Curated annotation (Swiss-Prot):
Homohexamer. Interacts with HSFA1A, HSFA1B and HSFA2. Negative regulator of the heat shock (HS) response. Affects negatively HSFA1B DNA-binding capacity in vitro. Involved in acquired thermotolerance but not basal thermotolerance. Crucial for seed development, after fertilization and during embryogenesis. Residues 34-63 form a coiled coil. Changing residue 49 to K: Expressed both in the cytoplasm and nucleus in normal conditions, but strongly reduced interaction with HSFA1A and HSFA1B. This is Heat shock factor-binding protein. GO terms for molecular function: heat shock protein binding; transcription corepressor activity. The lineage of its organism: Eukaryota, Viridiplantae, Streptophyta, Embryophyta, Tracheophyta. Signal peptide: none annotated.
């Protein structure tokens, strides 16, 4: 009877190991798919940003203001230094 219990334990351990390996493989595949999707979306957003920047520059050139800096942000992200205000 001990030999039979030992075989059941070994089979149960093998089944659990196979289950966990399969689960980890599925998780890896899903993670890779999501990662690829995120990278693709980030690349697309980067392309759109570049297109928007080019459109803005084209519009500014048409308006004749190409040499002027863009308006300062109102959020205070760019603090003014005394040297730049004189």
């Amino acid at each position: 009877m001990d030999g039979h219990d030992s075989e059941d334990t070994k089979q149960s351990t093998a089944d659990m190991t196979a289950f966990v390996q399969n689960l980890l493989q599925q998780m890896q595949t899903r993670f890779q798919t999501m990662s690829d999707s995120i990278i693709t979306k980030i690349d697309d957003m980067g392309g759109r940003i570049n297109e928007l920047e080019q459109s803005i520059n084209d519009l500014r050139a048409e308006m004749g203001v190409e040499g002027t800096p863009p308006p300062a942000s109102k959020s205070g992200d760019e603090p003014k230094t005394p040297a730049s205000s004189s």
